[in-house]
Regions:
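A structural signal for small-residue-enriched, beta-sheet-centric alpha/beta enzyme cores
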Residues: 180-186
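Aromatic/hydrophobic pocket-lining residues that form π-stacking "cages" and hydrophobic walls in ligand
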Residues: 100, 161, 330
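Flexible, D/E/H-enriched segments
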Residues: 1-48, 59-156, 187-326
Length: 337
């Protein structure tokens, strides 16, 4: 059996517009065309496994992995139900799901498989598999995004997945179903009026895409907390998919990236990005965080705050030097409070 590997990675948007209404907005059509191009790339690579990390499947009790060999249902989006419904019938690799579950627990993670009739597949996974694997030719696996998982836990989740990919000799494609900026309009808008929610969101999105196109995936992961504070709705789920995707690619900055499309979906930043593991040979890296192999502790209530916070700048007193004595400005002190 050949050594398994991740042959490609993709970032894809989560909302149903690209499936149900691509022609209502030129930007949605561009995203749909980018999905189609990504699907062709996956087919050309002869991948034999699609791995979906979806931000629209939140979990609290550990990491959940879809293990129903053929989940069938009809998905209606909670917000955009007016667009219609998406029937689905997916080809899930249950053997890989169970092996990943075992590997998670071997590395200290809380993990379980899900397999019962009627369990709803989230919108991000439905959109990704419907458009990237339209004929169900390639088996897939879907993992939840644990709401409280910090960088350490998310990195270990990826490494346990890599354990199974290598053990089974798979040609895998890693896919994060996510938005860039996720601030959305809170009222109805006409499709023709869709745009990124704010200029600030757009500027940050473009900087993220610049890094990804340069193959600097780990740099994006290292900036995850800053990105979350700047352009993400402040909730428990952080900008953690980049932690997972970077770890799936060996925490590298010398990848080959290509942005296939970037457009707004009801104000959120939607992008289709292809990340090729081929090295550009120019990616320097200066990491601020440790590499981890095992998860050794439970999530605490302070973890989320720790993940959001950056160290405060230290105040350094001026160096002593041969100079004049300090001057007391008494006329200014009178105004101090």
């Amino acid at each position: 059996m050949s050594q398994g590997e991740v042959v490609a990675s993709f970032v894809v948007p989560v909302h149903p517009h690209t499936v149900l209404a691509p022609d209502q907005n030129p930007g949605w059509r561009k995203l749909r065309d980018a999905f189609d191009e990504a699907a062709q790339t996956i087919q050309d690579l002869e991948a034999d496994l699609l791995i979906i990390y979806s931000t629209t499947w939140p979990s609290i009790i550990g990491h959940q992995i879809q293990a129903d060999p053929n989940p069938e249902w009809v998905m209606v989006d909670h917000d955009f139900h007016d667009l219609g419904s998406i029937p689905y019938s997916f080809n899930i690799d249950a053997d890989f799901a169970h092996a990943w579950d075992d590997a998670n627990r071997n590395r200290g993670l809380q993990s379980r498989c899900v397999n019962y009739k009627g369990f709803p597949i989230d919108v991000g996974s439905v959109v990704a598999l419907t458009l990237l694997n339209p004929d169900n030719r390639i088996p897939a696996v879907i993992v939840s995004s644990n709401m409280y998982a910090n960088r350490t836990e998310t990195t270990v989740l990826a490494k346990s997945c890599l354990d199974v990919i290598q053990a089974q000799g798979r040609k895998a494609v890693a896919i994060t179903a996510m938005s860039l900026s996720n601030r959305m309009f809170t009222d109805f808008i006409e499709a023709k009026d869709d745009k990124i929610h704010s200029l600030k969101d757009d500027e940050w999105n473009r900087k993220i895409l610049e890094f990804l196109e340069q193959g600097r995936l780990e740099d994006v992961g290292q900036l995850s907390r800053t990105i979350h504070r700047q352009i993400r709705v402040q909730k428990v789920v952080a900008f953690k998919p980049m932690w997972w995707l970077s770890a799936m690619n060996g925490n590298r900055n010398d990848l080959t990236g290509r942005v296939l499309a970037y457009e707004a979906i009801h104000g959120a930043g939607g992008a289709v990005v292809h990340i090729d593991p081929t090295s550009t040979g120019i990616g320097d890296k200066e990491y601020d965080e440790d590499d981890v192999e095992y998860f050794h502790g439970e999530r605490g209530v302070l973890d989320a705050d720790d993940e959001q916070a950056e160290p405060a700048p230290q105040s350094t007193p001026p160096a002593e030097a041969n100079g004049p004595e300090p001057v007391s400005y008494t006329h200014l002190r009178a105004h101090e409070t």
